[in-house]
Design a protein with these regions (language model features):
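Conserved NTP-donor binding/palm subdomain of two-metal-ion nucleotidyltransferases/polymerases, i.e.
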Residues: 1-115, 121-421
Length: 421
């Protein structure tokens, strides 16, 4: 682990658990700030009680950034309140997913970096909620790329992405990224039933409709697992850690959570991620249910999280894109579909002339070859990247969260398994 990552982890432990931090004398604080941003946890550090050993200029910069984040948090909270008031006035009572429903577990909710307002409505009310929002100034956000357009058509609107006054909202028809119909049906039934027993939680002066703690915890766990293949960062880990600290006692684990996580194939992932938090992020070891987690896997998962960044933000360079591409198992059919979609997404001529569409896969093949081979020592690097991709695949497989060729989607009026690409 490099010194920047060590400093980031030390800061998080100091702010959250009051551990005495230890920083190298030559710490590159600009690099630390960048890493905190790329992991989407700057607010957690800046919004807490900073150690005195952090230089004054850095403290001032972080405190200013924390103020900006806090302002955005309350703006989003107000927008969420307006949406809930609109829906409730018309007999629609959704629950908030992730976002504020994760922030409530933090010492100060505004410490958490926020994105969209995600909410789940009862299936029979989704179309009504969509129509109501469209009639009240909310607009659908258009998907631009061919890949995203096809994916949206395939999943038959897993969620509707909308915007108003600069804020984004996701109206979910269902939630989860799973590979077996039985798993999805079980989780969906739990969430739909959970909406009938939603809990009102006070968050920064606003009433927050949430799923019961079992269902809400599974949403946070599945959210991290679902994004793992594309890249998860410390914010996903923090959401889970703060939930565990607040809710997931040994008794709760044994009575209900373990069986539920096992049903979704996420029991080992839950144990490893929690034990990782205890070993490296300072989570108190009061929860003993994860003590049998493989410590080697904990270290590998931490390395992966630090390497990826928030939603894979640190994968933006060509080397990382090639590693991720090579880490995902694909059949010949999947490779051809991937190349075809890449070609349609980047070949302007194929977008303009229909006669060229059948040959888009060839353009996609050339594009990937150019990316992979147009580098110094390309063949040697490809070999190393293939090895790294294999290691990533093995890690996700050992954690039980490696997605196979199929993914479950909602089609018509039922869940079905369909090839992911």
């Amino acid at each position: 682990m490099d010194s920047i990552s060590q400093t980031v982890l030390s800061l998080l432990r100091a702010v959250l658990w009051k551990e005495e931090p230890s920083f190298p004398e030559d710490t590159d604080w600009n690099a630390v700030t960048k890493e905190l941003n790329m992991q989407a946890v700057l607010g957690v550090v800046a919004g807490g009680e900073l150690p005195r050993s952090v230089p004054a200029k850095v403290r001032e910069q972080w405190e200013y950034l924390a103020l900006i984040q806090g302002m955005r948090f309350y703006q989003l909270l107000h927008a969420q309140d307006e949406l809930l008031a609109l829906l409730n006035a018309h007999g629609i009572y959704p629950v908030i997913l992730k976002g504020m429903a994760a922030a409530v577990y933090y010492p100060s909710p505004e410490m958490r970096a926020m994105g969209d307002v995600d909410f789940l409505a009862q299936r029979k009310q989704v179309d009504e909620a969509l129509t109501l929002m469209l009639a009240n100034g909310y607009e659908l956000v258009e998907e631009e790329s061919a890949c995203l357009k096809r994916f949206r058509e395939l999943r038959n609107n897993k969620h509707f992405l909308m915007q108003k006054d600069g804020h984004h909202f996701e109206l979910h028809r269902y939630f989860g990224v799973l590979d077996l119909t039985a798993k999805m049906q079980w989780m969906d039934a739990l969430l739909q039933e959970g909406m009938q027993r939603r809990e009102q939680t006070l968050c920064c002066g606003s009433q927050l409709p949430m799923l019961p703690k079992l269902a809400n915890g599974l949403v946070l766990l599945q959210h991290a697992a679902g994004h793992a293949q594309g890249g998860i960062g410390l914010r996903h880990v923090m959401d889970w850690m703060m939930y565990v600290h607040t809710c997931l006692t040994d008794e709760f684990w044994q009575e209900s959570f373990a069986a539920a996580a096992r049903m979704l194939g996420l029991e080992n992932f839950a144990k490893v991620m929690t034990r990782m938090c205890q070993l490296y992020l300072g989570l108190p070891a009061s929860a003993s249910w994860c003590c049998d987690a493989d410590h080697a896997l904990c270290g590998q998962l931490l390395h992966y999280v630090l390497e990826q960044g928030h939603f894979g933000l640190k994968q933006s360079n060509v080397d990382e894109r090639i590693k991720r591409l090579l880490s995902e198992p694909k059949s010949i059919g999947q490779w051809l579909r991937l190349l075809q979609l890449s070609g349609m997404n980047h070949w302007e001529a194929a977008k303009k002339y229909a006669v060229l569409k059948p040959f888009a896969w060839m353009y996609g093949c050339g594009r990937y070859a150019h990316l992979a081979l147009g580098r110094n020592q390309a063949l040697g690097r490809l070999h190393e990247e293939k090895q790294e991709g294999d290691r990533r695949s093995k890690l996700l497989k050992d954690l039980g969260i490696l997605l196979g060729e199929k993914q479950v989607f909602w089609m018509g009026d039922q869940f079905v398994e369909h090839e992911r690409k």
